[in-house]
Amino acid sequence: MASGSNGRYILLISVHGLIRSHELELGRDADTGGQTKYVVDLARALGERDDVDRVDLVTRRLVDSSVSDDYAQPLESLSGKADIVRIDAGPEEYIPKEQLWDHLDSLTDNLVNWLNEQPRM
């Protein structure tokens, strides 16, 4: 995750969890509609800008046999300057967004820890 020193660093957060770079599961359930496609497309487009050094799209990491192993990978490239970053928060399995409220503190704590490990922070 190399970054320059003059461009913008953009952090996008989408807590739903079923976010990946390819074969989006649009319509799988109520949580996999247009937002998942929008945030992936937005991260890619921002990563193409000359004034942007790096874009991280943060979501929940899922280790769940009912979903693809892709969602268990902590890091996935979207483009040269854009990545999906998966952070542990709450249970490992996929849960509907309405059940995520109790786990947002965990997501925040783990995200802050991850950010503090990054070279530019």
Task: Give the location of each predicted region.
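Short, conserved, GDST-rich strand-edge loop motifs in beta-rich repeat architectures
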Residues: 22-27
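Short-chain dehydrogenase/reductase
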Residues: 28-37
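A conserved catalytic-core segment of Leloir-type glycosyltransferases
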Residues: 2-20, 32, 41, 45-120
